[in-house]
From Swiss-Prot:
GO cellular component, one term: ribonucleoprotein complex
PANTHER family: 50S RIBOSOMAL PROTEIN L28, LARGE RIBOSOMAL SUBUNIT PROTEIN BL28A
Sequence similarity: Belongs to the bacterial ribosomal protein bL28 family.
Tagged with keyword Ribonucleoprotein: yes
Any Gene Ontology biological process: translation
Stored NCBIfam families: L28
GO MF term set: structural constituent of ribosome
Pfam families the record matches: Ribosomal_L28
Protein name as catalogued: Large ribosomal subunit protein bL28
Gene for this chain: rpmB
Keywords: Ribonucleoprotein, Ribosomal protein
Organism (species): Mycoplasmopsis agalactiae (strain NCTC 10123 / CIP 59.7 / PG2)
Membrane-spanning intervals of the chain: none
InterPro entries: Bacterial_rp_bL28, Ribosomal_bL28, Ribosomal_bL28/bL31-like_sf, Ribosomal_bL28_bact-type, Ribosomal_bL28_sf
Length: 68
């Protein structure tokens, strides 16, 4: 399964790991994925893998309850 946010599609970023001598080697910054359960429009629960930032945004907008 790909490490990708199922709501907004945010995926891993690629950057450099810098040693003390400033030699650059490639590294990957993974997304902080969490599992949440949201009820559909018909009431059935659905499990999604979303990033922690998406959960924070959903709580701030009032879409997700504060307990999740």
């Amino acid at each position: 399964m790909a490490r990708r946010d199922q709501l907004n599609g945010k995926g891993p970023l690629v950057g450099n790991l810098r040693s003390h001598s400033m030699i650059a080697t490639k590294r990957k910054f993974n997304v902080n994925l969490q599992k949440i359960t949201i009820a559909n429009s018909n009431g059935t629960p659905t499990t999604l893998r979303v990033s922690a930032k998406t959960i924070k945004t959903l709580k701030r907008k009032g879409i997700l309850s504060a307990q999740a």
